[in-house]
Amino acid sequence: MAAPGSARRPLLLLLLLLLLGLMHCASAAMFMVKNGNGTACIMANFSAAFSVNYDTKSGPKNMTFDLPSDATVVLNRSSCGKENTSDPSLVIAFGRGHTLTLNFTRNATRYSVQLMSFVYNLSDTHLFPNASSKEIKTVESITDIRADIDKKYRCVSGTQVHMNNVTVTLHDATIQAYLSNSSFSRGETRCEQDRPSPTTAPPAPPSPSPSPVPKSPSVDKYNVSGTNGTCLLASMGLQLNLTYERKDNTTVTRLLNINPNKTSASGSCGAHLVTLELHSEGTTVLLFQFGMNASSSRFFLQGIQLNTILPDARDPAFKAANGSLRALQATVGNSYKCNAEEHVRVTKAFSVNIFKVWVQAFKVEGGQFGSVEECLLDENSMLIPIAVGGALAGLVLIVLIAYLVGRKRSHAGYQTI
């Protein structure tokens, strides 16, 4: 008779194999893009989880799934990029027409995954059962995945990227672009999520009286240049409008001005994306992204991303991003100008107030602003005095006509003696 323990061994072995299989499905995978010489220029090792909200005939539904182990790099769509022409990109395909794309860019000191996009096919009944639409959807967003040049980006914690109704979470991520030797660098830039939490501060003193509303921010000039010259000119004053929960559980809204005297600017020039990155007072990073619509030949503010520290907040690290904006639009080669204050809503909790903006992206001739395209707010403000002036002129004319008619009638009433 077999020993009692020996009967359990096949069952335990089967359970172990199933567990290893499940772990394998969720394990990190390596993706690589090589140039024509066979040298890797992009390496990425991560696992990814997707959360997608979509519509069914019975109502909204949420589907979560992992990047499968058989996901592959799309070689004919991935690229090491060409200087001043195109940026590096990694395109990963899986399932029935689903792709995850990481678009990279760099400046003199740092590189980043500037834009992440996800294309998903709702006709895939395995991932999206009972979907009311069979369309192929595309979503995209800027990210805070960035690292120093010649260092790898490392993030063991989950890195979330929100794209409208889709959230992509990268786990145990090691990513590096602009490689020269087909291997990850020893040096690394760690994500904020992996950094040690700050020491717990003592209880905050009683809240002071509300601080006064700051005056309008100072206007400063910014420019971004590449090897082909200037790709961005901007003159503007910037004010952050933040809503957050404080440590005492109260919700406050604060206005913070960007002080040009305590701000450094950098950026990058790409064929389809231009960025302006502002570092202010050692606690705030504000990123602007300008895109271009090739069919209409117009540029626009496409994305804004903010990372800042709010000492009195329950969560001092404040982050917000939106890569689907359509603001500050003008024809490529022209400049966009608005003297009126503009409010650009990024998220429910964050917006940017822009004062006296004058901006031009992509095509900048001779480092000077091109022909001006006025904003609607300025055009309306010009129409108001014209309308008021016209109304006053009409009123004066009516009074004058009434006076002349009255005078004529009074003369007609006299009799000659």
UniProtKB/Swiss-Prot annotation:
The keyword tRNA processing does not apply. O- and N-glycosylated; some of the 18 N-linked glycans are polylactosaminoglycans. (Microbial infection) The glycosylation of Asn-76 is essential for Lassa virus entry into cells. It is a single-pass type I membrane protein. Residues 1-28 form the signal peptide. Residues 29-382 are lumenal. Keywords: Cell membrane, Disulfide bond, Endosome, Glycoprotein, Host cell receptor for virus entry, Host-virus interaction, Lysosome, Membrane, Receptor, Signal, Transmembrane, Transmembrane helix. Residues 199-215 have a biased composition (Pro residues). Lysosomal membrane glycoprotein which plays an important role in lysosome biogenesis, lysosomal pH regulation, autophagy and cholesterol homeostasis. Acts as an important regulator of lysosomal lumen pH regulation by acting as a direct inhibitor of the proton channel TMEM175, facilitating lysosomal acidification for optimal hydrolase activity. Also plays an important role in NK-cells cytotoxicity. Mechanistically, participates in cytotoxic granule movement to the cell surface and perforin trafficking to the lytic granule. Belongs to the LAMP family. This is Lysosome-associated membrane glycoprotein 1.
